[in-house]
Amino acid sequence: MIQVLLVTICLAVFPYQGSSIILESGNVNDYEVVYPRKITPLPKGAVQPKNPCCDAATCKLTPGAQCAEGLCCDQCKFIKAGKICRRARGDNPDYRCTGQSGDCPRKHFYA
């Protein structure tokens, strides 16, 4: 409720031209002031970096590519099974690439 109220007040007091704003805010509490900030568009003529693993026109992987991103993807190929992609936390063991996906596994499954 407080977050919605602060955002509403903030937008009313600090209106900006344009359709998109980002609110700079962490944990909103009674004493925090939330300030809006404009989204900075790319300069005219600039293009976002091209991903060599992905064909932007078709939204598909390029020929020979196995993956386009992820902690277990390197140069469009799956990283070998067993490579640590995320270190252990608490009682969980290290997370390791499977060799079958560009993504690092989310959970461990025990038999």
Swiss-Prot record:
Task: Supply one GO CC term from the record.
Answer: extracellular region
Main localization of the protein described in the UniProt heading: secreted
Q: Where in the cell is it found?
A: Secreted
- Which stretch is the leader sequence? 1-20
Q: What InterPro entries is this protein classified in?
A: Disintegrin_CS, Disintegrin_dom, Disintegrin_dom_sf
Query: Is the keyword DNA repair in the record?
Result: no
What are the protein's UniProt keywords? Answer: Cell adhesion impairing toxin, Disulfide bond, Secreted, Signal, Toxin
Residues annotated as domain Disintegrin? 45-111
- Which regions span the lipid bilayer? none
List all disulphide bridges recorded for this chain: 53-76, 67-73, 72-97, 85-104
| One GO MF term | toxin activity
Prodomain residues: 21-44, 110-111
The entry describes its oligomerization and partners as:
Heterodimer with subunit beta; disulfide-linked.
Belongs to which family? Belongs to the disintegrin family. Dimeric disintegrin subfamily.
Function text? Acts by binding to alpha-IIb/beta-3 (ITGA2B/ITGB3) on the platelet surface and inhibits both ADP-induced platelet aggregation and platelet aggregate dissociation in human platelet-rich plasma.
Annotated protein name in UniProt: Disintegrin subunit alpha
